[in-house]
Amino acid sequence: WVHHPFDGDGMIAAFKFENGKINLTNRFVRTKEWAEEEKSQKFLYRGVFGTQKEGGILANAFDVRLKNIANTHVIKLGDDLLALWEASSPYSLNPNTLETNGLSDLKGVLKKGEAFSAHPRFDPGHHQSQRMVTFGVSTGPKSTIRLMEFSTEGENIGSLLSDRKDSFNGFAFLHDFAITPNWAIFLQNAISFNPLPFLLGQKGAAQCLASKSDGAPKFLLIPRDSGKFAGQPPKSVDAPKGFVFHHLNAWEDNEKINIESIFYDDFPSIGPEDNFREIDFDLLPEGILKRSEINPTENTFTCSTISNQCCEFAMVNPHFEGLKARFSWMATAEEKEGNGPLQAIKKIDLSNNEEISWSAAPRGFVSEPIFIPSQESKSEEDNGWVVALVWNSIRS
């Protein structure tokens, strides 16, 4: 077993709607490391979240190779499916067969092994063209964000449209971000990284992260090259306490910026001695959806809670990315309060916080819900379908 589900190899699922039926196809991403381990039938690489090779500390010490597991997200860019993992380059797949073509450098944009976010954002056309906005992070005492925009339409689909780099003081754990027409918004968590246990083979890299109780989280606001602040330096604004993996959406309200994010009281981690199959959820912080209003001019923010129910993997209608959206869909715990496994899918009206839910409990567990808008009625924000994989433990 892997020590943590996040160390698992990427498997892509494809839903095909034909003749009134749904066909499901799924295949592992045939990464170089997957092929090696499949052949040997054992772990040959350490996992970021704590999976170790056989042989104990001596076998793992000073082996700092990262296994590209291509397991976090999948997107379509031109004729390619791209399987993403934020610490390295994407893998290209055939969208029809899901066969693995190999690593992609995106037409020479990425250097070998360069970090490339698993959570790009798709601008629906704020500047008369649809584009993918994404980033890569180089971490250290001083961290650098590379912000990139790619065309997603026309003859130049997949071409790089803009590229800028900005550096910030401190270690940056940036898993996700949000966009508006003029800004790319990051939340730099107050977190530290002690690499020694990783180097000595005692922990995975992510297990060496720890929240800094005396740290000061910051919103990092980077002007988009397609927006009205192009070429200006980034802004740094104080942010709420807590830890954020994922953001829901962001939008501009005159000179202020609103961003909706899922906050944890602390960085949730599974230690070397823990077993993820026997986790006591009451001992782990839950994700709570909150809204922050940022005033870049005055370097201030306000923060309010949208829902107290434990949730993750929230999204809006893709046509409203970067705009004020009314509806959101997300995975939640079954109970209304407290932590727990994700067993339900919730739709929330962000204008009044009204909610409706569908539950797979007690023996069903949901994956990330995807909202697919109807092509027939784009004006109705919540007209579409919600697609998700559900694990039925009764049948497994």
Regions found by a protein language model. Give the residues of each.
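Beta-propeller domains
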Residues: 1-396
